[in-house]
Amino acid sequence: MVNKIPNTDLTLVDTPGLIPKGRISDMVCQDCNLNIVPSKEISRMTFKMKPNKVLLFGGLMWIKMLEVEEQNEEEKVKPIFTAFASKGVVFHETNEDRVEDMIKDHTGGILTPPCNNCKDEYRELAFKKETWTLDTNEELVFKGLGWISVKRGPLKIEINAPEDAEVILRDAFITPKRAR
């Protein structure tokens, strides 16, 4: 649909139905999509996790903390990061050895989204593992779901997400008043 805007040289072109690729929110049912896409205030939680701990974003994807090899014992600091997503997405911290059981037994229950209606179809998607190292004031975006922002780095993680999910590294939108 093309509309000429009166009293201007502007023309508005509407392209309904064009869906950008790579959004996790498009890989679930409509009800889950409504829970993933923020409509009001978003949820945020700050974490200071040890290596081999895992943070689940509902039953949609998870990130595992890895050890940063470059640091010597005197320089070792625990990374601090904040996770952001819609209030409809549950953050859950667990041990690495419990992830498979948590996903199998609790997706659609305490781990939402996905819901019981689309969890089986979602689990059939091919998943990928990627390793990322982020520095202070960098963010990793999980397109169509949320992001993490590193407050104190370096943060080395392994992400487990659907193969078609796009992951983007960017500078932090909001930075602390002073770097630590």
Give residue ranges: language-model regions.
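Helix-rich effector regions associated with P-loop NTPase G domains
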Residues: 1-180
